[in-house]
Structures are given as structure tokens and as C-alpha cells.
A protein has these predicted regions:
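Bacterial carbohydrate/catabolite-sensing allosteric modules
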Residues: 8-21, 36, 42-50, 54-187
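Structural motif
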Residues: 1, 28, 163-164
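Short, ordered loop/turn segments at secondary-structure junctions
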Residues: 3-5, 30, 53-54
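Intrinsically disordered, low-complexity polar regions and short flexible loop motifs
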Residues: 25
């Protein structure tokens, strides 16, 4: 189920779970704070695992991602390749999706700001409405594609564009190819 971070959908799916008799549930983002107690109660009957940032208030099995570290690794790699004028494309950076912001933060603080290139990094995030709309199969791809087209018009000195995830990166690549950029090479 994709709740698209909609509280009503999340509640509906959580209420529906017991009747579906699942073998287990994998939550790929932290449950909304208003549903943590419900998730804990359900986890007594159904195996639950949460994949995302650690949440000390949630008492279920979890796989923690260090999104800040992921951002630092991305930045370090680009700096090692000699890139100093870069753009970072992300889905909406909302309170509900803190991991996105943590990755951006790691990208900036971990390397580019340390090297005094922080002012050479453009962060381009999609509008919050995208998280509220029903997701299309290509929503993240479209974010990468559309925001890359905008970036190329606004910033002519970029040497690299990074996407928060693979689907965004595919959109970035297609936009660059359409604009006749050689990747790797010119971007």
C-alpha cells in the first residue's frame, strides 16, 4: 500500500490490515506519530519492520538508514570527481519526510560546506502538492525530468546534478540526454 503520506489513507490501511491476514508488514517510512500506538499493537499479532530513520518512540523491529551519511557519501564522490557546481534534486522536503532533508543536509554540510563550495550547490525540491496528489507510476521520474529542465535554464555553470533516489536520477538522465548533454562528460 502506498499512503503517499496521507494520514487518512494510512489510517484506513492500518485498520484494514488485520482482515487481510498478512504474513508481515514492511513500513518503508516511519509511521505517523498519531498511529505509532496502533502500529505497536498490530505488531503484537503481525510481524512489523520499519525501514527508515530511527524513531526511539516506536517499539517495533527496524532497519535504520543514516540518510545524513548517504548525503555525505554522495557529496564526497562528486568532490573527488572534481565537481564544485552541483544541483541536488529532491521530492518535497517536508516535515513528514525528514529523511529527505537529512540526506540534503548531509550532502551540504558533510562535504561541500567543508570545502567552502556550499554556495555552489543548488537544492531544487519539488512542490509539496506532489506528495498530496495520488502518485503516478512515474511521479519521481517526472520530478527528476521536470526539475532538471528548469535547472538547465536557470544555471548554466552546473557540472553535476544529483537525484535523491534512482527514479529521480533516471528522470535527470533523460532530461540531460534530451538536451544533448554527454553523460558522463559534460555533466
Amino acid at each position: 500500500c502506498n499512503t503517499q503520506r496521507d494520514l487518512e489513507l494510512e489510517e484506513r490501511y492500518l485498520k484494514m490490515l488485520p482482515s487481510l491476514n498478512p504474513q508481515g508488514v514492511i513500513y518503508t517510512c516511519n509511521p505517523s506519530s498519531c498511529f505509532m500506538e496502533t502500529v505497536e499493537q498490530l505488531s503484537n499479532k503481525i510481524p512489523f519492520a520499519v525501514i527508515n530513520n530511527q524513531n526511539e518512540r516506536l517499539n517495533v523491529d527496524a532497519v535504520e538508514l543514516d540518510n545524513s551519511k548517504l548525503g555525505r557519501i554522495m557529496a564526497k564522490h562528486l568532490l573527488e570527481l572534481g565537481h564544485t557546481h552541483v544541483a541536488y534534486i529532491a521530492p518535497p522536503l517536508t516535515v513528514r519526510q525528514k529523511q529527505r532533508s537529512k540526506r540534503v543536509e548531509g550532502f551540504l554540510k558533510g562535504s561541500f560546506r567543508k570545502q567552502d563550495f556550499g554556495d555552489h550547490v543548488v537544492i531544487k525540491a519539488a512542490d509539496e502538492q506532489i506528495d498530496k496528489d495520488v502518485p503516478g507510476i512515474d511521479s519521481e521520474y517526472r520530478i527528476g525530468y521536470d526539475l532538471t529542465k528548469e535547472l538547465l535554464k536557470e544555471h548554466t555553470d552546473l557540472t553535476a546534478i544529483v537525484g535523491l533516489n534512482d527514479m529521480i536520477a533516471f528522470g535527470i538522465l533523460d532530461a540531460l540526454y534530451e538536451e544533448k548533454y554527454k553523460v558522463p562528460g559534460e555533466m
